[in-house]
């Protein structure tokens, strides 16, 4: 596969950078929509997203570099060439969570509600970002045959062709992870829609459990894994994240929800206040109209009664006068 989309002079625009950018944009859109649905000020989502993306990418790169110091010590500038690949998602997740934690403390907002907003964006972004690995011809599995790949039925022909590297076919583990992340995204959306009594943080735990479970098994096929002595680093981190998130999910089931105020959308509040004021004014006007109409009716009735009584008095006085004259 050709990793370069196009060139403008000496500047290369690579597929890897393109898919990372698309993943970030899609993630922002999803987070903003969910924030709006929860009536959270979009400035909070923007600020949180900005810092999380920046430090998340830095964390993913730092994690990768630390496991490949022997490569980068000979070419220090290669550390900054992110378009060549070399982002480890676990580093991004860990630093991203730390960033959101610090952000929530500074803004005095609920961290778990923010991570619940981010979780669907992150897993979908991971699915999109894996296509950058495809064009870089990286993150693949062991050697296999064309027949084996075709027998799986779920792998498109263009992916199979792209997995032929130097005349040899490899397992497209990037594609397996793409499908797993896509499935995880659908599951999270369904749980978020139908599990109404969930606690803040359970969506985050669900994301970590789903991704860690899939990554553990897919990593066993990877041939370019980062290693901790004789263990694959991604599998070790996946086990830790799965166990920790599972325990925390159970704890949240029995924990009372503590409502921490998050700055809500001012525009929506203003509109609601205006509508409430309009309704109050309309009710007041209706009351005024009713009171004035009732007053007018009472005045008319008193006038009628007074005229009737006066006419009766005059008639009675006339009768008495006639009687006296007689």
Language-model regions: role of each:
Residues 1-284, 326:
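A feature for loop-to-transmembrane-helix boundaries and adjacent hydrophobic helices
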């Amino acid at each position: 596969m050709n990793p370069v989309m196009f060139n403008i002079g000496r500047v290369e625009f690579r597929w890897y950078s393109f898919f990372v950018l698309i993943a970030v944009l899609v993630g922002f859109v999803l987070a903003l929509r969910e924030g709006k649905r929860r009536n959270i000020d979009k400035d909070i989502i923007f600020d949180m997203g900005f810092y999380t993306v920046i430090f998340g990418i830095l964390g993913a790169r730092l994690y990768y570099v630390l496991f490949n110091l022997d490569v980068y010590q000979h070419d220090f500038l290669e550390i900054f060439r992110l378009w060549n690949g070399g982002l480890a998602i676990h580093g991004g997740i860990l630093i991203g969570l730390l960033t959101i934690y610090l952000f929530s403390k500074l803004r005095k907002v609920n961290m778990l509600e923010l991570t619940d907003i981010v979780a669907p964006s992150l897993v979908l972004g991971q699915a999109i970002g894996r296509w950058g690995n495809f064009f870089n011809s990286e993150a693949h599995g062991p050697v296999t045959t064309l027949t084996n790949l075709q027998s799986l039925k779920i792998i498109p022909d263009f992916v199979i062709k792209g997995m032929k590297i130097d005349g040899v076919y490899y397992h497209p583990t990037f594609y397996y992870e793409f499908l797993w992340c896509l499935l995880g995204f659908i599951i999270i959306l369904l749980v978020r829609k139908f599990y109404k009594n969930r606690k803040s943080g359970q969506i985050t735990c669900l994301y970590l459990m789903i991704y860690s479970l899939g990554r553990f098994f897919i990593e066993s096929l990877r041939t370019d894994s980062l290693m901790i002595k004789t263990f694959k680093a991604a599998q070790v981190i996946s086990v830790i994240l799965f166990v920790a998130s599972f325990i925390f999910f159970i704890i949240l089931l029995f924990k009372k929800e503590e409502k921490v105020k998050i700055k809500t959308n001012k525009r929506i509040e203003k509109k609601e206040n205006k509508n409430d004021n309009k309704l109050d004014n309309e009710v007041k006007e209706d009351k005024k109209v009713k009171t004035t109409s009732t007053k007018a009716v009472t005045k008319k009735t008193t006038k009628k009664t007074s005229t009737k009584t006066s006419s009766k008095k005059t008639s009675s006085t006339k009768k008495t006068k006639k009687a006296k004259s007689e």
